């Protein structure tokens, strides 16, 4: 299984266009040892030629330009993107579909809940019907494994997660199973297994056992502390209110990962998170625990 980190930041990217927090200011001024990051998305392949996107970042055009494997190379106009899987309907995970309209029709896998959001509050399916048939919905049934024809060696098991639906969802304050997914991806040829969950609000015992099966954990790294947005002067909500488990504190992501084997990589990192500063004590804690911070262009093979 080939995994390409197309984007590794949370919504807004890093630096965020309207943010002057310590991290964003330091990166722009060159006083912070850190790397710019685009909004999160990954690509998966079982052969290096045909690819599946997991989420479609608003930065998808630049991400394709940075990854030759996705660029047109077989015809005057074509793409190696054979399908897309949406783990939720958050604006930073599906707006990239608009930028892919010239390549429609696209095969899009998502749950009934996500499909509802993208036909009502943010009606991408209806909008894109006008481009060569638009998006062909392939329903994801919770806990039922599925395969995508273009990458037959990969088996996807969708796992419902506790998180939050986006503000435009008709059930924003009434969570439903299927609003947010994690994916357990297994390669039948190599035996490699990936657990991918860029939006993860809570880890219970059954989910922990699922995570224990994975050779690589690619998980929510949004915030270091639950009140980080408030502390940085960038917002008024706790991470837990937005559906993100912070890294620090009792029951935080560090504590969860400490009890698990396999490669551990944080993704979907908010611009305020001190782990972006490569010289920060928080980053040093990750290094000491053997936890990596995803970066754009990172490759993982399982």
Curated annotation (Swiss-Prot):
Recorded superkingdom: Bacteria
Keyword rRNA-binding attached: no
SUPFAM superfamilies per the UniProt record, alphabetical: Metallo-hydrolase/oxidoreductase
Recorded metabolic or biological pathway in which this protein acts: Cofactor biosynthesis; pyrroloquinoline quinone biosynthesis
Stretches that traverse the bilayer: none
UniProt record similarity statement: Belongs to the PqqB family.
A single GO BP: pyrroloquinoline quinone biosynthetic process
Pfam families documented for this protein: Lactamase_B_2 (PF12706)
Keyword GTP-binding carried by entry: no
Function per UniProt: May be involved in the transport of PQQ or its precursor to the periplasm.
Name this protein carries in UniProt: Coenzyme PQQ synthesis protein B
The species this protein was found in: Azotobacter vinelandii (strain DJ / ATCC BAA-1303)
Keywords: PQQ biosynthesis, Transport
PANTHER family for this protein: COENZYME PQQ SYNTHESIS PROTEIN B, HYDROLASE C777.06C-RELATED-RELATED
């Amino acid at each position: 299984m080939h995994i390409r980190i197309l984007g590794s930041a949370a919504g807004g990217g890093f630096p965020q266009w309207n943010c002057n927090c310590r991290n964003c200011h330091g990166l722009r001024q060159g006083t912070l040892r850190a790397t710019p990051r685009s909004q999160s998305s990954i690509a998966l392949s079982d052969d290096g030629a045909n690819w599946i996107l997991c989420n479609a970042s608003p930065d998808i055009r630049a991400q394709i330009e940075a990854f030759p494997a996705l660029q047109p190379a077989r015809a005057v106009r074509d793409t190696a993107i054979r399908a897309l899987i949406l783990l939720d309907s958050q604006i930073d995970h599906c707006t990239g579909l608009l930028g892919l309209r010239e390549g429609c029709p696209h095969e899009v896998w998502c749950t009934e809940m996500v499909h509802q959001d993208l036909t009502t509050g943010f009606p991408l399916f209806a909008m894109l019907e006008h481009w060569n048939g638009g998006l062909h919905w392939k329903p994801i049934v919770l806990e039922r494994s599925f395969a995508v024809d273009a990458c037959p060696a990969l088996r996807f098991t969708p796992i419902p997660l506790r998180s939050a639906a986006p503000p435009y969802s008709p059930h924003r304050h009434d969570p439903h199973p299927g609003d947010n997914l994690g994916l357990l991806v297994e390669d039948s040829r190599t035996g490699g297994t990936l657990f991918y969950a860029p939006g993860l609000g809570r880890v219970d015992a059954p989910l922990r056992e699922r995570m224990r099966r994975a050779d690589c954990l690619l998980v929510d790294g949004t915030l270091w502390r639950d009140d980080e947005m408030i502390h940085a002067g960038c917002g008024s909500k706790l991470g837990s209110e937005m559906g993100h488990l912070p890294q620090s504190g009792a029951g935080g992501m560090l504590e969860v990962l400490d009890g698990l084997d396999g490669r551990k990589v944080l993704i979907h990192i908010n611009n305020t998170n001190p782990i972006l500063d490569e010289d920060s004590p928080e980053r040093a804690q990750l290094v000491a625990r053997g936890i990596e911070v995803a970066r754009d262009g990172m490759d993982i093979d399982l």
